[in-house]
Amino acid sequence: MGLPGVIPALVLRGQLLLSVLWLLGPQTSRGLVITPPGPEFVLNISSTFVLTCSGSAPVMWEQMSQVPWQEAAMNQDGTFSSVLTLTNVTGGDTGEYFCVYNNSLGPELSERKRIYIFVPDPTMGFLPMDSEDLFIFVTDVTETTIPCRVTDPQLEVTLHEKKVDIPLHVPYDHQRGFTGTFEDKTYICKTTIGDREVDSDTYYVYSLQVSSINVSVNAVQTVVRQGESITIRCIVMGNDVVNFQWTYPRMKSGRLVEPVTDYLFGVPSRIGSILHIPTAELSDSGTYTCNVSVSVNDHGDEKAINISVIENGYVRLLETLGDVEIAELHRSRTLRVVFEAYPMPSVLWLKDNRTLGDSGAGELVLSTRNMSETRYVSELILVRVKVSEAGYYTMRAFHEDDEVQLSFKLQVNVPVRVLELSESHPANGEQTIRCRGRGMPQPNVTWSTCRDLKRCPRKLSPTPLGNSSKEESQLETNVTFWEEDQEYEVVSTLRLRHVDQPLSVRCMLQNSMGGDSQEVTVVPHSLPFKVVVISAILALVVLTVISLIILIMLWQKKPRYEIRWKVIESVSSDGHEYIYVDPVQLPYDSTWELPRDQLVLGRTLGSGAFGQVVEATAHGLSHSQATMKVAVKMLKSTARSSEKQALMSELKIMSHLGPHLNVVNLLGACTKGGPIYIITEYCRYGDLVDYLHRNKHTFLQRHSNKHCPPSAELYSNALPVGFSLPSHLNLTGESDGGYMDMSKDESIDYVPMLDMKGDIKYADIESPSYMAPYDNYVPSAPERTYRATLINDSPVLSYTDLVGFSYQVANGMDFLASKNCVHRDLAARNVLICEGKLVKICDFGLARDIMRDSNYISKGSTFLPLKWMAPESIFNSLYTTLSDVWSFGILLWEIFTLGGTPYPELPMNDQFYNAIKRGYRMAQPAHASDEIYEIMQKCWEEKFETRPPFSQLVLLLERLLGEGYKKKYQQVDEEFLRSDHPAILRSQARFPGIHSLRSPLDTSSVLYTAVQPNESDNDYIIPLPDPKPDVADEGLPEGSPSLASSTLNEVNTSSTISCDSPLELQEEPQQAEPEAQLEQPQDSGCPGPLAEAEDSFL
């Protein structure tokens, strides 16, 4: 088939003639029609085929990018046709043919018809391809087509990667080829013609990373004046290779502008095309379009912008203000004018023809800003408007081409206020009331009256007054405008002809800003005397009510007695939030109840702000002793109900904890028929601080010899040779020690016992039947009739005693920690000394005047021992057994300073709190060894989780004591558990199945969580599981003292043990002499041992 490159002139002239005829002839709406019809045809090789396409306008045939040979004609019915004749066809004629309207000769019609022709050619399996079509570029993961087109639609075609025989499963279309998603590889198509395999050309697929096109178009100015320049930028982000094409108004006149390409390297990269017209003309107004395309995938985008070229600049108002603008006094007011202008104008604000400027004090603010390219807003902000700012304002906006101005009046509205309301009594008997007020706008005056003075302001509407026809009242009003103040003043005078009873008259002024009123009571000329009396009574009542309120507030702020001991119920997962047992909800066991007639109160051992501790004699507490000296805790008669509840809570906690050798044990209680009494053990030598102060001289005298180190100290039951007691040291039972009187006030009001029991009176307590072992050093002491086991019966205070005190306190606190009990006030003042230097932990804050005690600091309605408290307790109110460990470290410092006051160098103010936060710790005491001070430092760790538990402190202190001391302590502890001590007996009555054997505590465990309840011990607050006897026996190391616990022995003995009575054994075999006397070394500077050698604590 011949496809000439140039159409002959005759044919061209025919087409022009047909076009003219079409323009002059009738129009039809008929579409394109191909004859013969069909989507595809299969032709025999070397055959001839004719296709005719007709339409309502000149039409033509297209094959791909070529124009095949065709003949155009105009039919008689007014339609146009084109005949395509294919002669001697070959396989190369296979392809698609399009019939389209000839756009260059007719209207722009976009309709087109397609037909596909196959010419099977055995010599040509695949259609030949141009070399550029063998390279296929794809972007991202989009589908593409490998154009393996064949001449015969009956052939089966497969796609392979080159050099791989396995075909790929990709959809195939005989007219298009394989369509799918391909990787960056080389592909080949295969088919079979007869018995011959035919391969296509090799296709190369390449993936290109082409990001999406992001086009932005902006102009320096979209509005320009004639003669100014136009500059438009078209910017593409993130693409490296793009094509720019501009469309602009000058193109119509053939005046082209060469754009400039600008490369801006960076992340991301930018490419820009700049279209610049240096001198704008009015004809340059219009739309400027920037079309950007990517040559790889023909993807593109375009943006347009409108440019207006004006002959001259302009200024036009868009939003104006009214002729009168209102501002309210002392409120900010913004006056805003919106206008449109080009170029940007200058703006001035004037008040009363004087130019305004920004106020340095911020009272006036001027601003003009762009809302858009040619739209502006100018604002005048008056901050807290004043009356002087009222007046006439003008806003001027101008430039060299145009000017506009706006004028208005600013009125400042002032709230109305009554300045004066006065009453006068002229001589003619009239009542004259004058009301003067001011405001802007002009206020209106309203007078009203009410005769029921009690109900008038609340329930009755006043009756309006005015000029009465009966001439009972006359009203006169004058209005004046003050130009300087820019407000109106109203003066209204009301004249009442006759007033026969008290009358309430109200003057009310009102305007748009609100109203104000005042009232005056008009009375007859003779004022009744009862008004004066009533006023005085009311004033007195008000003063009385205020005084009562003040007294109630002071009473509520008065400190209350609070129990310091708390029992932990549960702990949060992070270990920083604790829930404590509410002791109010605990039951009280009546087995602890002691009849009041079996208790005889004696002298006061200590008294405080909330209560007192009294020495007493109890009858019938034990089987072996008819009477027993005890200590009784009680509240004052003025105690509040909350304080009584606190004391009852303390009783419940003590009754549930159980007995222990180093805790002041509960012996009984009186809760019925009178005030609450808590009966505890009596410790004759008072608290540890007072004990250390009283015996400090014996310690210092013993260690005054510098050649006698503490390690040479021996455990002795007798005085060293050559050591004599000072003459002023009295060791009798009644005067040696005793409770430290913690209150200087001896006149304590006791609750009369006669009110409860008529046959019981206060009596002096007789001296106990037992005498202190110290008495054997006093010539007048009677002969002792028995021998008791004591930890230490030496009257001399030794270093071993200090370590022993620390060891015993640690044992007692370990017992409380095992019960989840937090002490919260562990200090030397709350540790008592008993016979044989046995120490017991207590809480006698009830008997201490904490409001005058410098050791307690007021915080809210309570007093806190801040010097003994851990940082988490001071700053976060967190109390745990490990915060008690911190307090134990302070107690060690007290012991080894012989009763010193902690932090002597720090005042109790912000300096103390800042020092604790910075990690300040007290220095090593003079009498403390390095081992003791190391224990103190462990107790003072900043993070409470790293402090050692009391079980570990017991072991650390136990290592510093000799075997003799530990054995005697263990012996005393065992005798205590086997005795008929009242605490033991009553606990056995409540828990008959509890074994006396104590299981050693696991030193690695710290009490963080509450122990789960056990059914067999359901009376305990937080019960512990029953230990197995055989396991406990095996776990107890030989020679080590048993740790504290509340378990009891079922075996009762006939003897009774008291804190101050020597421990008597059931059957004590004949004892030999305690220890052989050791010879005193000659010429020794150190006192020699006289009895059993004291084990070194080092």
Swiss-Prot record:
Residue ranges occupied by any Ig-like C2-type domain in the UniProt entry: 33-119, 128-209, 213-308, 330-402, 415-523
Signal peptide residue numbers: 1-31
Modified residues (Phosphotyrosine): 561, 578, 580, 685, 715, 739, 750, 762, 770, 774, 777, 856, 933, 969, 1008, 1020
InterPro entries, per the entry: Ig-like_dom, Ig-like_dom_sf, Ig-like_fold, Ig_sub, Ig_sub2, Immunoglobulin_dom, Kinase-like_dom_sf, PGFRB
Mutagenesis / variant outcome for changing residue 1008 to F: Strongly reduced levels of vascular smooth muscle cells and pericytes in developing blood vessels
Glycosylation sites noted in the Swiss-Prot or TrEMBL record: 44, 88, 102, 214, 291, 306, 353, 370, 444, 467, 478
Transmembrane segments: 532-552
Keyword annotations: ATP-binding, Cell membrane, Chemotaxis, Cytoplasmic vesicle, Developmental protein, Disulfide bond, Glycoprotein, Immunoglobulin domain, Kinase, Lysosome, Membrane, Nucleotide-binding, Phosphoprotein, Receptor, Repeat, Signal, Transferase, Transmembrane, Transmembrane helix, Tyrosine-protein kinase, Ubl conjugation
Quaternary structure and partners: Interacts with homodimeric PDGFB and PDGFD, and with heterodimers formed by PDGFA and PDGFB. May also interact with homodimeric PDGFC. Monomer in the absence of bound ligand. Interaction with homodimeric PDGFB, heterodimers formed by PDGFA and PDGFB or homodimeric PDGFD, leads to receptor dimerization, where both PDGFRA homodimers and heterodimers with PDGFRB are observed. Interacts with SH2B2/APS. Interacts directly (tyrosine phosphorylated) with SHB. Interacts (tyrosine phosphorylated) with PIK3R1 and RASA1. Interacts (tyrosine phosphorylated) with CBL.
Family stated for the protein in its record: Belongs to the protein kinase superfamily. Tyr protein kinase family. CSF-1/PDGF receptor subfamily.
The protein's name in its UniProt record: Platelet-derived growth factor receptor beta
High-level lineage: Eukaryota, Metazoa, Chordata, Craniata, Vertebrata
Gene: Pdgfrb
